[in-house]
């Protein structure tokens, strides 16, 4: 069953934030060791930032197309 768009819009950033908080609590050198692209910590910071931004701009584009079509 496919979830509705408003549910996914809220669910994806919350799951990303939970992953960020989990990695912050588990990783010992969380802020210091996240500079190298080869570390797992780098990607645990990158995904929670990238996913909500992608969802926001995808919805922004979709709303722009809807508003443009109705004007």
From Swiss-Prot:
- What's a GO cellular component annotated to this UniProt protein? endoplasmic reticulum membrane
Q: How does it sit in the membrane?
A: Multi-pass membrane protein
Q: Where is this protein localized, as stated in its record?
A: Endoplasmic reticulum membrane
Could you list this entry's UniProt keywords, alphabetically sorted: Endoplasmic reticulum, GPI-anchor biosynthesis, Membrane, Transmembrane, Transmembrane helix
Report which superkingdom the organism of origin falls in: Eukaryota
Q: In which pathway does it act?
A: Glycolipid biosynthesis; glycosylphosphatidylinositol-anchor biosynthesis
- Function noted in UniProt: Part of the glycosylphosphatidylinositol-N-acetylglucosaminyltransferase (GPI-GnT) complex that catalyzes the transfer of N-acetylglucosamine from UDP-N-acetylglucosamine to phosphatidylinositol and participates in the first step of GPI biosynthesis. May act by regulating the catalytic subunit PIGA.
- Name of the protein this chain belongs to: Phosphatidylinositol N-acetylglucosaminyltransferase subunit Y
- Gene designation: Pigy
């Amino acid at each position: 069953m496919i979830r509705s768009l408003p549910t996914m819009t809220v669910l994806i950033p919350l799951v990303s934030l939970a992953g960020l908080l989990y990695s912050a609590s588990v990783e010992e050198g969380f802020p210091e060791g996240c500079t190298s692209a080869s570390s797992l910590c780098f990607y645990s910071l990158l995904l929670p930032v990238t996913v909500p931004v992608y969802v926001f701009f995808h919805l922004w584009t979709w709303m722009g197309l809807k508003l443009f079509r109705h004007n």
